[in-house]
């Protein structure tokens, strides 16, 4: 694996010179191998090690290099044709392979090659970009987008129109991460490498980026870039120091543990916020 990483790192240093016409065989094979390993879930761009999320930057570099070494080509879809550098993940799947891998894909959901979809996942008409990882038992609902290299945990529900930001455009240092057992409400956006920790509930229409203030009304603490585990979060505003205006924020209205989540439905958690 170290040899593979070295090839990717060296190629990335001269990426501006690489084109589909001049990409050497060693680089091309290394990039294709990484994309295949990401596609199968054998590798992932970020993983939790000793309780901390670690980003494997070289894998992200391999994803970026794949755009340098591949030319656009015509691809056939169910209702149209496509012209792109990245093949569709399911282009060569037959019924036996879908059954073996154990997830559902509702037309016209689109998944790019290099994204991993785990068992018991349901993809409604949605979009999952290259390098993303969607773990077991999750639902990607209608018109939701899972951005490049984003990490989605087990038993996560991404509601209709949710946007989970990617790392490639604009280039970000770390992927956006939604940990296990989270609920992201309709039309919410989580971007710029924000981490939503395990068991959190994000209400409809909440926007979270690195500069978004995440205000805990119980403690008065303000978080940036991280929603603490078990938080129930809604949209809000915080006043300026002189009270002349207010600016958008996200508000942690309560904390819940796994036992409470198991007994109480998501809707009830969001409705009883007083």
From Swiss-Prot:
Q: Which SUPFAM superfamilies does this one have? A: Trimeric LpxA-like enzymes (SSF51161)
Q: Which InterPro entries match?
A: DapD_Trfase_Hexpep_rpt_fam, Hexapep, Hexapep_transf_CS, THP_succinylTrfase_dom1, THP_succinylTrfase_N_sf, Trimer_LpxA-like_sf
Any one GO BP annotation for this protein:
diaminopimelate biosynthetic process
Quote the Pfam families the UniProt record gives: Hexapep_2, THDPS_N_2
Pathway field: Amino-acid biosynthesis; L-lysine biosynthesis via DAP pathway; LL-2,6-diaminopimelate from (S)-tetrahydrodipicolinate (succinylase route): step 1/3
> What EC number(s) are associated with this protein in UniProt?
2.3.1.117
Gene3D superfamilies in the cross-refs: Hexapeptide repeat proteins, Tetrahydrodipicolinate-N-succinyltransferase, N-terminal domain
Subcellular location, in the record's words? Cytoplasm
Where, in this chain's numbering, is substrate bound? 104, 141
Q: Which UniProt keywords apply?
A: Acyltransferase, Amino-acid biosynthesis, Cytoplasm, Diaminopimelate biosynthesis, Lysine biosynthesis, Repeat, Transferase
Where is this protein primarily located? Answer: cytoplasm
GO molecular function terms noted in the UniProt entry: 2,3,4,5-tetrahydropyridine-2,6-dicarboxylate N-succinyltransferase activity; nucleotidyltransferase activity
Highest taxon listed in the record's lineage = Bacteria
Keyword set includes Amino-acid biosynthesis: yes
Reactions catalysed according to its record: (S)-2,3,4,5-tetrahydrodipicolinate + succinyl-CoA + H2O = (S)-2-succinylamino-6-oxoheptanedioate + CoA
Q: How does it assemble?
A: Homotrimer.
Which family does the record claim for this protein?
Belongs to the transferase hexapeptide repeat family.
The protein's name is 2,3,4,5-tetrahydropyridine-2,6-dicarboxylate N-succinyltransferase
Species annotation: Serratia proteamaculans (strain 568)
| Gene name per UniProt | dapD
């Amino acid at each position: 694996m170290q040899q593979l990483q070295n090839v990717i790192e060296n190629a990335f240093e001269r990426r501006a010179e690489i084109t589909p016409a001049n990409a050497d065989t060693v680089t091309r094979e290394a990039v294709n191998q990484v994309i295949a390993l990401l596609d199968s879930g054998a590798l992932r761009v970020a993983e939790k090690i000793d309780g901390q999320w670690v980003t494997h930057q070289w894998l992200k570099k391999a994803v970026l290099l794949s755009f340098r070494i591949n030319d656009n080509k015509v691809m056939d879809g169910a209702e149209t044709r496509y012209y792109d550098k990245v093949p569709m993940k399911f282009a060569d799947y037959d019924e036996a392979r879908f059954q073996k891998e154990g997830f559902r894909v509702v037309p016209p959901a689109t998944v790019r090659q290099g994204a991993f979809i785990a068992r018991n996942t349901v993809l409604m008409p949605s979009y999952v970009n290259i390098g993303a990882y969607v773990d077991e038992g999750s639902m990607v609902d209608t018109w939701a987008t899972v951005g490049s290299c984003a990490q989605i945990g087990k038993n996560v529900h991404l509601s209709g129109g949710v946007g989970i930001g990617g790392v490639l455009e604009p280039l970000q240092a770390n992927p956006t991460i939604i940990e296990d057992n989270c609920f992201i409400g309709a039309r919410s956006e989580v971007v710029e490498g924000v981490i939503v920790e395990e068991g959190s509930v994000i209400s409809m229409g909440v926007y979270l980026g690195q500069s978004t203030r995440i205000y805990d009304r119980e403690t008065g603490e303000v978080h940036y870039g991280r929603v603490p585990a078990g938080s129930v979060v809604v949209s809000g505003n915080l006043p300026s120091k002189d009270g002349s205006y207010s600016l958008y924020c996200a508000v942690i209205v309560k904390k819940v543990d796994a036992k409470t989540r198991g007994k109480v439905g998501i809707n009830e958690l969001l409705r009883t916020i007083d």
